[in-house]
């Protein structure tokens, strides 16, 4: 038998007792050249995989929009793992600093890690430059950091919201390194329902209470139609003097308020 035919021999797939584990253990096919196959002397390649190995199952609804009096940020509080509801009290709005907020959509670990890292980098910027980092610079910093890991399985779609000397700022950043400036965004499995409410009721000159009501109604509508969103509506308002947490309303209470009210 030629040496080439030995080296190119396919790996056995799902054979019982493979690698001496016994007991009917089934192992995944790791592919030729994988560690432990006893055939390849070369080091395994740790590059970008040809196909994803883990299917990320997640769902959420987050939104943010700019208006005359700042930026409104709202999110639901349900965490899911496939069809399993893991928690109803997850905080999906991350407080980066007193003037910056970030939202979580995608993998909770990815969002939490990268936005905590962003908070640290923003603080270092302030200490070095003796001034607050701008919303544009913070969002660009996050986009540059995650772009280095493009294609490696990160799952993150976040909005960076804040107020700087240019006024209110809102940017969408995702794990592919995309960065978009805009006036209104919604991210997550329930975003299609939230957009419908926002598109109907949004205007830049909304009064403060009208903006609060619009955000609550948009998240409520998403939780009503999307099984992966629910829990409570956490509402924040970014103003010139910093952000404030406005309210946290259970969607069951909002159902009593909005179920019989038509969208204007």
Curated annotation (Swiss-Prot):
EC number, as in UniProt: 3.4.25.1
Keyword Methyltransferase: no
Organs and tissues of expression: Expressed in uterus at the embryo implantation site.
Top-rank taxon: Eukaryota
Example of a GO cellular component annotation carried by this entry: centrosome
Keywords of the record: Cytoplasm, Hydrolase, Nucleus, Protease, Proteasome, Threonine protease, Zymogen
Positions of the pro-segment in this chain: 1-59
Major site of localization recorded for this protein: cytoplasm
Any matching Pfam family: Proteasome
Gene Ontology BP, a term: proteolysis
Active site: 60 (nucleophile)
Binding positions for bortezomib per the UniProt entry: 108
Gene Ontology MF, one: peptidase activity
Induction or repression: Up-regulated in embryonic fibroblasts and neuroblastoma cells by antioxidants through the Nrf2-ARE pathway (at protein level). Up-regulated by the antioxidant dithiolethione (D3T) in liver, small intestine and brain (at protein level). Down-regulated under lithium treatment.
Family statement drawn from the similarity comment of this UniProt entry: Belongs to the peptidase T1B family.
Binding partners and assembly: The 26S proteasome consists of a 20S proteasome core and two 19S regulatory subunits. The 20S proteasome core is a barrel-shaped complex made of 28 subunits that are arranged in four stacked rings. The two outer rings are each formed by seven alpha subunits, and the two inner rings are formed by seven beta subunits. The proteolytic activity is exerted by three beta-subunits PSMB5, PSMB6 and PSMB7. Directly interacts with POMP. Interacts with ABCB1 and TAP1.
Function: Component of the 20S core proteasome complex involved in the proteolytic degradation of most intracellular proteins. This complex plays numerous essential roles within the cell by associating with different regulatory particles. Associated with two 19S regulatory particles, forms the 26S proteasome and thus participates in the ATP-dependent degradation of ubiquitinated proteins.
Protein's UniProt name: Proteasome subunit beta type-5
Organism: Mus musculus (Mouse)
């Amino acid at each position: 038998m030629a040496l080439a035919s030995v080296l190119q021999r396919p790996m056995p797939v799902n054979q019982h007792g493979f690698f001496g584990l016994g007991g009917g253990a089934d192992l995944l096919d790791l592919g030729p050249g994988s560690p432990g196959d006893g055939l390849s002397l070369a080091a395994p390649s740790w590059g970008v995989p040809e196909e994803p190995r883990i299917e990320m199952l997640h769902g959420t609804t987050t939104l943010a929009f700019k208006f005359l009096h700042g930026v409104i940020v709202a999110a639901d509080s349900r965490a899911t793992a496939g069809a399993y509801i893991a928690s109803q009290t997850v905080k999906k709005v991350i407080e980066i600093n007193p003037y910056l907020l970030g939202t979580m959509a995608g993998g909770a670990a990815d969002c939490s890690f990268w936005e905590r890292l962003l908070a640290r980098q923003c603080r270092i910027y302030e200490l070095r430059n003796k001034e607050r980092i701008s919303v544009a610079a913070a969002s660009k910093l996050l986009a540059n950091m995650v772009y280095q890991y493009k294609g490696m399985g990160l799952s993150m779609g976040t909005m960076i919201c804040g107020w700087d000397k240019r006024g209110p700022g809102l940017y969408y950043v995702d794990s592919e390194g995309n960065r978009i400036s805009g006036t209104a965004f919604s991210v997550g499995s329930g975003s299609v329902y939230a957009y419908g409410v926002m598109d109907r009721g949004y205007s830049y000159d909304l009064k403060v209470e009208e903006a609060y009501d619009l955000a609550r109604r948009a998240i409520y509508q998403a939780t009503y139609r999307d099984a992966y969103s629910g829990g409570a509506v956490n509402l924040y308002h970014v103003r010139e003097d910093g952000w404030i947490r406005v309210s946290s309303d259970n969607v069951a209470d909002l159902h009593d308020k909005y179920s019989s009210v038509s969208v204007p």
